[in-house]
Amino acid sequence: MNRKDAYRIAIEAEIRSQNLYKALAKSFKNEETTQFYSQLMLYEKDHEMKVRGLYAQEFPHEKLKLVGKLDMQMEGLELGDPKAVLEFAISREELAQKIYLKLAEQSEDASTKALLKQLAAEEEQHKELLYAEIEKIQGLLKWFDRSELDGFMEH
């Protein structure tokens, strides 16, 4: 994969992630959860703009052509399973992180390399936020062990 393709793939991945988080933000009735996904969507939009800037800087006379389908491919994903959806989102963050690290490794310009490493680090932070959501969901689903209630409830 050449650098143009890597930038294009990274931008397409950011747009797909934005679309995923936008859909997730709309699908929850809980305001806190909606805000969480809306914020992630904004982070991904910021990444898209930064990567577009890097592309324009490196290839100033070449128009960026997005070729991938920009809707999130979620065949086989159980949308009714919040944990599965969050794990899918984590996999998308991991993909973006790998692309940024590969681009940084290939970059000769120090400022470009630094920005790409920063983007990779931010993707790691996004993963941590998503893992925290999984823990929160699991905590809500398993907030007590029924056996601990034996003796406290009348039969």
Whereabouts are the PLM-identified features?
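Iron-associated oxidoreductase/ferritin-like identity signal
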Residues: 1-155
